[in-house]
């Protein structure tokens, strides 16, 4: 086997669909803001990486906590911590001491209500904003990713309701519901 004889398209296609760009590459959902054309497709597929092994969220969270500490030392201010997708899981676990707020863009989930992460965020008084893009409510019913993203968004809404009821400050922004359409998982 040579590298030239392998076809990686099926795996790429799964992410294209899961990230709600379109049903099948190179098709885009109607109204999509994802750029048209071969060059855009090429760049999208280039960002795919192979499985590089286990991912230790605790190590990543501790490292980012050190970065937040350094930022506060250098600036005198806590940071607004922005996460996206799988990075959301890391963000919920970063030590809260040096974080002013969290902005989570389509995190793959939220902390379980009552969990250590939930309690840490609530106790620290960290305000949270969670954003979701388009093609969740209007995505194809026969694609598993559509129901996955609905469940993630519904979980975020439940998290926000309880976080707010417990005295926290969490807002979930569903971009299409405020008139901002055409955004996929990448916004």
Identify the meaning behind each predicted range.
Residues 101-175:
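The feature captures the conserved acid-bearing segment of alpha/beta-hydrolase catalytic domains
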Residues 81-82, 102:
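Conserved alpha/beta-hydrolase fold motif
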Residues 40-56:
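Short glycine/proline- and acidic residue-enriched helix-loop micro-motifs
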Residues 170-187:
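C-terminal catalytic histidine-bearing segment of alpha/beta-hydrolase fold enzymes
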Residues 1-30, 137-149:
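Short, surface-exposed "cap/lid" segments of acyl-processing enzymes
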Residues 57-79:
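Conserved acidic catalytic loop of the alpha/beta-hydrolase fold
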Residues 82-91:
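Gly/Ala-rich beta-loop-alpha elbow adjacent to hydrolase catalytic centers
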Residues 94-95:
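Aromatic pocket-lining residues of Rossmann-like dinucleotide-binding sites
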């Amino acid at each position: 086997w040579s590298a030239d004889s392998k076809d990686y398209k099926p795996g790429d296609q799964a992410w294209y669909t899961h990230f709600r760009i379109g049903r099948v590459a190179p098709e885009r959902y109607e109204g999509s803001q994802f750029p048209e054309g071969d060059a855009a497709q090429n760049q999208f597929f280039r960002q795919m990486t192979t499985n590089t092994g286990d991912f230790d969220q605790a190590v990543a969270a501790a490292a980012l906590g050190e970065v937040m500490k350094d930022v506060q030392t250098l600036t005198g201010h806590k940071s607004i911590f922005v996460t996206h997708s799988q990075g959301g899981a890391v963000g919920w676990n970063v030590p809260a001491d040096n974080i002013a707020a969290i902005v989570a863009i389509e995190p793959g989930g939220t902390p379980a209500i009552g969990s250590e992460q939930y309690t840490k965020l609530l106790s620290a008084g960290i305000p949270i904003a969670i954003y979701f893009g388009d093609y969740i409510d209007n995505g194809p019913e026969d694609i598993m990713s559509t129901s996955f993203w609905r469940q993630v968004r519904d979980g975020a809404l439940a998290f926000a309701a309880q976080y707010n009821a417990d005295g926290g400050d969490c807002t979930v922004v569903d971009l299409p519901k405020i008139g901002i359409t055409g955004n996929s998982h990448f916004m």
